[in-house]
Curated annotation (Swiss-Prot):
This is Serine/threonine-protein kinase tousled-like 2. It comes from Xenopus tropicalis. PROSITE patterns: PROTEIN_KINASE_ATP, PROTEIN_KINASE_DOM, PROTEIN_KINASE_ST. ATP binds at L393, G394, R395, G396, G397, F398, S399, E400, V401, K416. The gene is tlk2. Belongs to the protein kinase superfamily. Ser/Thr protein kinase family. Its EC number is 2.7.11.1.
Length: 697
C-alpha cells in the first residue's frame, strides 16, 4: 500500500492533506510516500469530488501573540505537517493499526434506505473541509475530527450492499406494482366514467322515450274517452225517444222538470189497455154464455122457455139453447183465451219491469252527462302532473268522482275532488278540511282485500282538494237492489260474509275503527253482480276507538249525533239526553242485519218508504223493538235467527263484531257438516224402519 501512495500524484496528495488538516497547500513538493498513502486511504473519492471541494476564506490574523504551533517553524511560517497520512487516519478516525483506511470514510449507503433517500448526509470531508490556505488551530482541528468520528459511528448500520440492493429491488418492484395498480385503477375509472356517461345518455334517451310514451298514452286515452263520451251521448239521445226524457214545465212563477215516458212505455201501456179490453169482452161473453147454459140431465126445461125463444126470434137474435157439449166447448174456449191474455199480461209486466230498470240507468246517465257538462274538469286535465281525468262517475253534495288514469303507476284510479262552497266561512271550510284529513289518515293505513285502498291525497287550491282511491269497475249494492229488488239467500250470505270479514279486520287493528256508515251505497260490487267480490268504502264518519275515548264496558261517546243514514243506525244512536250516547262496534253489527234483511226481502226492516226526517220525527228506530219477517220470499230459519241476533234492540243483548265473525250461520264447514249429517241419520232411520217392517211381515 505504501508503494501505491508513493506512486500518487504529488498535487493530489497535497490537496488531500489540505482537506483533512486544514493547512494551506504548500508550494513545495511533498514526498511521494505521503501522497500515495493519502490516495490509498481515500481511494473512494474521485478527482471530481476533490476539485469541487469548497474552500473557506482565511481567518483574519489575530493581533495578539499566541503560542506557536508545533507545526510552525522558528521563523513563524507555516510549514506542511511532517507526519504521514497514515498517522492522521489513526488520529482522526481512531482506527487501529489493523483497520483499513477505507472503512474510516462514513458510507452513506450504510444508513437505512429511508434515511438515505430522505435525509442524505454530507461526506465528512464536505462537512469539515477548511480552506486550503488558512492557518489551522490544532485543537480546533482535533475537535472537529472527533465530532466527525462520533457522527460516523452514529450513522453506521449493519446493512450490507446486498441487503440494500435487495431492499431497493423490492421497493422498486412494489413501486412498479403500485404504479401498475394505479394505472389499472385509472383505466377502470376511465371505463366507469365512460360507462356512466353512456348510461346517462341512455337514461336521457329512455326518459325522452318514456315522455313520448306518456304523451302518446295521454293522447290515446283522451281520444278513447272522447269516443266513449260521444257514444254515451248518442245512446242517450236514442233512449230519450224510446225510454223518455225530462221536460221543463212551468208552474206559476217557477219551472220544474217533469218526466215524460218514451214510445216503448207507451206501446206497452197500449198493449195493457188492449188486454184489459179483451178481458172485459171475454167476461161479458162468458156471462152471456152462462145464460144459455143448458139444463142438467134429468131436469125439465122451464115453462117460459118457449116464450123466451119466441121473444128472441121477434128481436132478431137467434139465441137458441145450447146443448151441453156446445156449452162446455164454448166455456173451454173462453178459459183458454183468458189464460192466454193472462200470460201475455205477465210478459208485458215483465217487460215493463225490465224497461223500468233500463229507464233508471237512462235517468242516471242523463244526470251524469248533465253534471259532466257543467263540471270545470270536463276537458281532461292532468291533476298533480300524474292523474289524467277521463270521465265523471258521479257527483255528491260537495264532491265529484272521476275515473282517471295514473300516468306514473299505469293504472286506473278513482279521483274524488272535494270542492268547498266559496261562500262558506273560513271556520266551516277549516272544519270540512279537517274532517277530510281525518278520513284520509284513517283510510290511508287500511290494507285489506275487502276495503277500497286509498292511494294519494293532494290539494288543488284553497277551496278544493283530491283523494285518489282504488277504482272498481262495477256499481254499488244500492244500485243493484234498485235494479233487481232482492237476491237469493246464498248471494246475500256471501256478501254478508265478506262485510263481516272486513269488520273483523277493522276491529283487530290498533286502534280499532267503527265504520258507522255501513249501507248498500258504501258497498261496491267489483263485478257489478251479487255473486262476486265486494269492497267497503267511505270512511268519512268512522270512529277511532283509541284508549283516551273508548271504554271496553260503555264504549265511546257519539260526538256526531244526527249524522249517518238513519235506516241503518241502531236505537242507541237516537237517544237524546244530557250526555251523548255511548256506542261500540255493535253499531256496525246492526247495520249488517239491516243490509242482510234488505237483500233478502227487497225492503228495509224499519222505516221503509220513509224519509230521514220522518224517521227522526216519528222515532221509528226507537220503536223498532222487534223485527217482523214477511211470508215471501221464503227464507231459512237460520237466516232469520241470524238477523234477530244482529237486530237485538238492547245493545247489551246484541252480539259484537268478534262474535259475529264466529257466528255458526257464517261458517260454511259447520253448516255443511250439519246438513250432511241430517240426511245420513234420516237414511239410517229409514233403513232400520224398513228392516223392522220386513221382519214383522
Amino acid at each position: 500500500m505504501m508503494e501505491e501512495l508513493h506512486s500518487l500524484d504529488p498535487r493530489r496528495q497535497e490537496l488531500l492533506e489540505a482537506r483533512f488538516t486544514g493547512v494551506g497547500v504548500a508550494k513545495a513538493p511533498l514526498n511521494s510516500e505521503s501522497s500515495n498513502q493519502s490516495l490509498c486511504s481515500l481511494g473512494s473519492l474521485s478527482d471530481k469530488e476533490l476539485e469541487q471541494t469548497p474552500e473557506k476564506k482565511q481567518n483574519d490574523q489575530r493581533n495578539r501573540k499566541r503560542k506557536a504551533d508545533p507545526y510552525e517553524t522558528s521563523q513563524g511560517k507555516n510549514t506542511p505537517r511532517g507526519h504521514k497520512i497514515s498517522d492522521y487516519f489513526e488520529f482522526a478516525c481512531g482506527s487501529g493499526p489493523g483497520t483499513s483506511p477505507g472503512r474510516s470514510v462514513p458510507p452513506v449507503a450504510r444508513s437505512s434506505p429511508q434515511h438515505s433517500l430522505s435525509n442524505p448526509l454530507p461526506l465528512p470531508s464536505q462537512q469539515c473541509s477548511p480552506p486550503s490556505t488558512a492557518p489551522v488551530n490544532p485543537e480546533h482541528s482535533c475537535a472537529s475530527f472527533k465530532h466527525i468520528s462520533v457522527q460516523h459511528r452514529c450513522t453506521q448500520s449493519d446493512l450490507t450492499m446486498d441487503k440494500i440492493s435487495a431492499l431497493e429491488n423490492s421497493k422498486s418492484s412494489d413501486l412498479e406494482k403500485k404504479e401498475g395498480r394505479i394505472d389499472d385503477l385509472l383505466r377502470v375509472n376511465c371505463d366507469l366514467r365512460r360507462q356512466m356517461d353512456e348510461q346517462k345518455k341512455m337514461l336521457e334517451k329512455y326518459k325522452e322515450r318514456l315522455n313520448r310514451c306518456v304523451t302518446m298514452s295521454k293522447k290515446l286515452l283522451i281520444e278513447k274517452s272522447k269516443q266513449e263520451k260521444m257514444a254515451c251521448r248518442d245512446k242517450s239521445m236514442q233512449d230519450r225517444l224510446r225510454l223518455g226524457h225530462f221536460t221543463t214545465v212551468r208552474h206559476g212563477a217557477s219551472f220544474t222538470e217533469q218526466w215524460t215516458d218514451g214510445y216503448a212505455f207507451q206501446n206497452l201501456i197500449k198493449q195493457q189497455e188492449r188486454i184489459n179490453t179483451q178481458r172485459e169482452e171475454i167476461e161479458r161473453q162468458r156471462k152471456m154464455l152462462a145464460k144459455r147454459k143448458p139444463p142438467a140431465m134429468g131436469q125439465t126445461p122451464p115453462a117460459n122457455n118457449e116464450q123466451k125463444q119466441r121473444k128472441n126470434k121477434t128481436n132478431g137474435a137467434e139465441n137458441e139453447a145450447l146443448t151441453l157439449a156446445e156449452y162446455h166447448e164454448q166455456e173451454e174456449i173462453f178459459k183458454l183465451r183468458l189464460g192466454h191474455l193472462k200470460k201475455e199480461e205477465a210478459e208485458i209486466q215483465a217487460e215493463l219491469e225490465r224497461l223500468e230498470r233500463v229507464r233508471n240507468l237512462h235517468i242516471r246517465e242523463l244526470k251524469r252527462i248533465h253534471n259532466e257538462d257543467n263540471s270545470q274538469f270536463k276537458d281532461h286535465p292532468t291533476l298533480n302532473d300524474r292523474y289524467l281525468l277521463l270521465h265523471l262517475l258521479g257527483r255528491g253534495g260537495f264532491s265529484e268522482v272521476y275515473k282517471a288514469f295514473d300516468l306514473t303507476e299505469q293504472r286506473y284510479v278513482a279521483v274524488k275532488i272535494h270542492q268547498l262552497n266559496k261562500n262558506w266561512r273560513d271556520e266551516k271550510k277549516e272544519n270540512y278540511h279537517k274532517h277530510a284529513c281525518r278520513e284520509y289518515r284513517i283510510h290511508k293505513e287500511l290494507d285489506h282485500p275487502r276495503i277500497v285502498k286509498l292511494y294519494d291525497y293532494f290539494s288543488l287550491d284553497t277551496d278544493s282538494f283530491c283523494t285518489v282511491l282504488e277504482y272498481c269497475e262495477g256499481n254499488d249494492l244500492d244500485f243493484y237492489l234498485k235494479q233487481h229488488k232482492l237476491m237469493t239467500e246464498k248471494e246475500a250470505r256471501s256478501i254478508i260474509m265478506q262485510i263481516v270479514n272486513a269488520l273483523k279486520y277493522l276491529n283487530e287493528i290498533k286502534p280499532p275503527i267503527i265504520h258507522y256508515d255501513l249501507k248498500p251505497g258504501n258497498i261496491l260490487l267489483v263485478n257489478g253482480t251479487a255473486c262476486g267480490e265486494i269492497k267497503i268504502t267511505d270512511f268519512g264518519l268512522s270512529k277511532i276507538m283509541d284508549d283516551d275515548s273508548y271504554n271496553s264496558v260503555d264504549g265511546m261517546e257519539l260526538t256526531s249525533q244526527g249524522a249517518g243514514t238513519y235506516w241503518y243506525l241502531p236505537p242507541e244512536c237516537f237517544v237524546v239526553g244530557k250526555e251523548p250516547p255511548k256506542i261500540s262496534n255493535k253499531v256496525d253489527v246492526w247495520s249488517v242485519g239491516v243490509i242482510f234483511y234488505q237483500c233478502l226481502y227487497g225492503r228495509k226492516p224499519f222505516g221503509h218508504n220513509q224519509s230521514q226526517q220522518d224517521i227522526l220525527q216519528e222515532n221509528t228506530i226507537l220503536k223498532a223493538t222487534e223485527v217482523q219477517f214477511p211470508p215471501k220470499p221464503v227464507v231459512t230459519p237460520e237466516a232469520k235467527a241470524f238477523i234477530r241476533r244482529c237486530l237485538a234492540y238492547r245493545k247489551e243483548d246484541r252480539i259484537d263484531v268478534q262474535q259475529l265473525a264466529c257466528d255458526p250461520y257464517l261458517l260454511p264447514h259447520i253448516r255443511k257438516s250439519v246438513s250432511t249429517s241430517i240426511p245420513a241419520n234420516a237414511a239410517v232411520a229409514s233403513t232400520s224402519g224398513s228392516s223392522n217392517n220386513s221382519l214383522s211381515n
